[in-house]
Amino acid sequence: MVGSMENPGSWGLACLLISTSRFNRYMPYYTMMAAVWSTLIAGALKLQEDPASLSVEYILFKAGLCFVHCLLLCGAGNTWNDLIDRDIDARVERTKMRPLASGKVSTVEALVWMVGQYFLSVKMLDLILDNRSIWGLMLPLTASIMLYPYLKRPVFSRVFIYPQYILGLAVAYPSITGWASINGQEQSMSEIFTHCTPICLLIFFWCLYFNTAYSHQDSVDDRKMNINSAYVVAGQRIRLFLAFLGALPLAVIPYVVLKINSPWLWFSWMAVWTVSIVMQIVRFDSKKLESGGRIHWDNFLLGLWTTVACIVEVGLQKVEFWNLI
């Protein structure tokens, strides 16, 4: 369906386009977490070395720019996904009323909306990196976003390539942007990549875990249409598979926290994440498809908690709290 079923009016069209970007739902806000966490951790590390080197306001400003950049890029990516998958979405119960799948938004309208969001995200990245070359960061991320919907096709399952791989990469990659927003003038790109590797792996594994649980909601319709997704690896052992995936980010967290070695981060990351993920696996019921959506939501709350924890750590480093006790 590529044409509008009816003219919704300017306000109605705006609401539909916002829905196409998912800005009216919590999902896009996952994509800001890698960049924001990386910005805050990089800022906290710099304050640990020299509390006078940066202001808290500057670090939060950079984190805010990263948030807007990632949100806009995610909106463009979601619009692209719905453009490519509109015929598939029309046959899946959970997605059949999406604006493109239902014909309420035309292909041309969606394309214009997508390009506008992408352009604004590029301009925002230019601000974040203080007019440095941005395409070295932007092009790999753009390629992964464009590739993502095609990996749902069954041909990729034959070589064990699943869309969650690319989604995890796309969500994790902006951690490089976040680190560069603080250290871009002082560190080479190879140094930035090295510093960001632990947090990139953490976000990648985390995304693989919660998105596999989320996509399991559509398993009945997906099997009918032979849609490729990571949960097919597990078969009937989906709980065991999710437990394995949930253990992967927990294994990486120490390498992230050790950079600062803050007691607060050890508690707010390692302890809270461990309890949360264990509880999620215990509550998961493979016979109730909606329980995968509950895991997705629980991890969003976990991500918000981690963002707040990182902001608190920036404040603790600024006042040299750990030197006072």
From Swiss-Prot:
It is a multi-pass membrane protein. Glycans are attached at N131. Pathway: Secondary metabolite biosynthesis; terpenoid biosynthesis. The keyword Coiled coil does not apply. This is Polyprenyl transferase mpaA. It is an enzyme of class 2 (transferase). It catalyses: 5,7-dihydroxy-4-methylphthalide + (2E,6E)-farnesyl diphosphate = 4-farnesyl-3,5-dihydroxy-6-methylphthalide + diphosphate. One of its GO terms (biological process) is terpenoid biosynthetic process. PROSITE patterns: UBIA. It holds the Pfam family UbiA. GO terms for cellular component: Golgi apparatus; Golgi membrane; plasma membrane. Keywords: Glycoprotein, Golgi apparatus, Membrane, Transferase, Transmembrane, Transmembrane helix. The chain crosses the membrane at residues 27-47, 56-76, 108-128, 134-151, 159-179, 192-212, 240-260, 262-282, 295-315. It comes from Penicillium roqueforti (strain FM164).
